[in-house]
């Protein structure tokens, strides 16, 4: 399947669009976003977002004691006449102090000074699932005893995440558990971008990096998080089913699972393993397999082993580029047949289209060395490799305009490094393969002993065998995540 030429497919660059929950309030939304840029005092901000002291301390105590019962918070009882002022938009903030270089701890301290120490959580000390179980559980316990202030705070709460894409995805994934537990509403999430790529942050208008003048920017960001509109975001479940006995070191976003399932009705080219291991997780932006993941894997290992070599964004990019060359991303076609390293040799791709229950086999072009399934408009620090496609090309290929909440993943391929480079500077679009509502990959070994994969920037090495296939199944999570729009 050939990608279009530049003139056929690419229009002027557009800001990614997301559907707003408040469809009738366009003027109201515009006004609120404009108000978010107005200078706001510390006192005004606190009045808008800070919880009453008795609830702040009760939530803290429940988390420390790992007990969500009302009794665990009884050390600070509500006032006899509970006339505590309910904040308009109560905020809870999660900070990854390892993000943002040396600024992470300072940003955490500034946040605590602005809205109270008890409303800012260090993710190295309090995990998001602990806050959800014990902190929100504490609020719900107060509300069940007739505390109207606690009830309103639980209903109005918003979350701010200060960190990179991985941190944001971690918090979103934990919040998604509230849907399964029928503990509604699920708080929407705002983003304070402290990571490297920050593609989630870019896609929802929070920017690609935090401003240099971060002290004043924090206050504006908190205010904007309390007034900006909310959008929906698809999330995607991934299940990897592999032969038992294979050893894999998965990223923290993948967890071991016993729920392995292989669709016997689907055409399988290899052999089904007699016994299996499984890993399961959720991603929000992209999953990829191939050379891009191999380069990312090498870079991440170097950064972990020798952090002093990757101490800033410029150094990171230089090292990343060096890995791209050393792994053969650029030079393979000069020294060998590029088809020998194409993913076609190890991978079979099946998809389901939107509103279809039938699997369809999709050919992988032999020149493609990386396949990416993309949910957002932003990949690789703000690039849009799928491109903004013209309507006639969309109709010709049977595609629809890509959105973050349309129930579809855009699948594209990258060839040798020069092709990837031109895609990344948006001179051309990637090699369009398909749009899919569900994906099944079958990978099998041979001359290749490992495949490299990554999910929202977290790479790993996936072992393969000659005898049995490994399967990767991707499907949409039924409940969408809620993200506050920053623009």
UniProtKB/Swiss-Prot annotation:
It is found in: Endoplasmic reticulum; Cytoplasm, Cytosol. Highly expressed in pollen grains. Expressed in roots, hypocotyls, leaf vasculature, developing anthers and stigmas, and receptacles of siliques. Keywords: ATP-binding, Cytoplasm, Endoplasmic reticulum, Kinase, Nucleotide-binding, Plant defense, Stress response, Transferase. One of its GO terms (cellular component) is endoplasmic reticulum. GO terms for biological process: defense response; phospholipase C-activating G protein-coupled receptor signaling pathway. It catalyses: a 1,2-diacyl-sn-glycerol + ATP = a 1,2-diacyl-sn-glycero-3-phosphate + ADP + H(+). Residues 86-242 form the DAGKc domain. Its main location: endoplasmic reticulum. InterPro entries: ATP-NAD_kinase_N (IPR017438), DGK (IPR037607), Diacylglycerol_kin_accessory (IPR000756), Diacylglycerol_kinase_cat_dom (IPR001206), Diacylglycerol_kinase_pln (IPR016961), NAD/diacylglycerol_kinase_sf (IPR016064). Its EC number is 2.7.1.107. Disruption phenotype: Reduced plant size with small and curly leaves. Reduced growth rate of pollen tubes and reduced number of seeds. No visible phenotype under normal growth conditions, but the double mutants dgk2 and dgk4 exhibit defective pollen growth and seed development because of non-viable male gametophyte. One of its GO terms (molecular function) is ATP-dependent diacylglycerol kinase activity. Monomer. Phosphorylates the second messenger diacylglycerol (DAG) to generate phosphatidic acid (PA), another important signaling molecule. PA is required for plant development and responses to abiotic stress and pathogen attack. May be involved in the accumulation of PA during cold stress. Involved in the regulation of PA and phosphatidylcholine biosynthesis in growing pollen tubes. Required for nitric oxide-dependent pollen tube growth and re-orientation responses. Belongs to the eukaryotic diacylglycerol kinase family. This is Diacylglycerol kinase 4. The gene is DGK4.
């Amino acid at each position: 399947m050939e990608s279009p030429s530049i003139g056929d497919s690419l229009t002027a660059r557009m800001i990614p669009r997301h559907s707003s929950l408040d469809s009738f309030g366009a003027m109201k939304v515009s006004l609120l976003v404009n108000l978010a840029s107005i200078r706001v005092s510390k006192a005004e901000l606190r009045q808008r977002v800070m919880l009453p002291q008795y609830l702040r301390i009760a939530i803290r105590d429940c988390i420390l004691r790992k007990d969500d019962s009302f009794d665990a918070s009884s050390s600070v009882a509500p006032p006899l006449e509970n006339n505590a002022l309910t904040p308009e938009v109560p905020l809870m903030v999660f900070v990854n102090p390892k993000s943002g270089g040396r600024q992470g701890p300072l940003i955490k301290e500034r946040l605590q000074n602005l809205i109270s120490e008890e409303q800012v959580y260090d993710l190295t000390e309090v995990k998001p699932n602990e806050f959800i179980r014990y902190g929100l559980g504490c609020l719900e316990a107060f509300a069940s005893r007739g505390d109207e202030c606690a009830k309103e705070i639980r209903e109005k709460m918003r979350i701010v995440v200060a960190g990179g894409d991985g941190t944001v995805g971690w918090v979103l994934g934990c919040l998604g558990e509230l849907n399964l537990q029928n503990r509604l509403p699920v708080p929407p999430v705002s983003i304070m971008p402290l990571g490297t790529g920050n593609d989630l942050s870019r896609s929802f208008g929070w920017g690609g990096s935090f401003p240099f003048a971060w002290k004043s920017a924090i206050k504006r960001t908190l205010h904007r998080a309390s007034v900006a509109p909310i959008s929906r975001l698809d999330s995607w479940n991934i299940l990897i089913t592999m032969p038992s006995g294979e050893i894999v070191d998965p990223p923290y976003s993948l967890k071991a699972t016993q729920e392995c399932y292989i669709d016997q009705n689907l055409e399988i080219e290899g052999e089904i393993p007699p016994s299996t291991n499984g890993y399961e997780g959720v991603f929000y932006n992209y999953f990829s397999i191939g050379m891009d993941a191999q380069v990312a894997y090498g870079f991440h290992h170097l950064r972990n082993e020798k952090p002093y070599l990757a101490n800033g964004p410029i150094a990171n990019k230089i090292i990343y580029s060096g890995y791209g060359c050393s792994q053969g991303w650029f030079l393979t076609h000069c020294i060998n047949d590029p088809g020998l390293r194409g993913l076609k040799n190890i991978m079979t791709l099946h998809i389901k289209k939107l509103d279809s229950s039938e699997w369809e086999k999709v050919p992988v072009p032999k020149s493609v060395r990386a396949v990416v399934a993309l949910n957002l408009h932003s990949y690789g620090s703000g690039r849009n490799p799928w491109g903004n496609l013209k309507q006639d090309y969309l109709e010709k290929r049977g595609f629809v305009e890509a959105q973050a909440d349309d129930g579809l993943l855009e699948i594209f391929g990258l060839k040798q490094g020069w092709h990837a480079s031109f895609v990344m500077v948006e001179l051309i679009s990637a090699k369009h393969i398909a749009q899919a509502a569900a994906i099944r990959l079958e990978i099998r070994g041979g001359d290749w002993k490992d495949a490299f994969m990554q999910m929202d920037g977290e790479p790993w090495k996936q072992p393969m065998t000659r005898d049995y296939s490994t399967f990767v199944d991707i499907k949409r999570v039924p409940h969408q995540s809620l993200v506050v729009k920053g623009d």
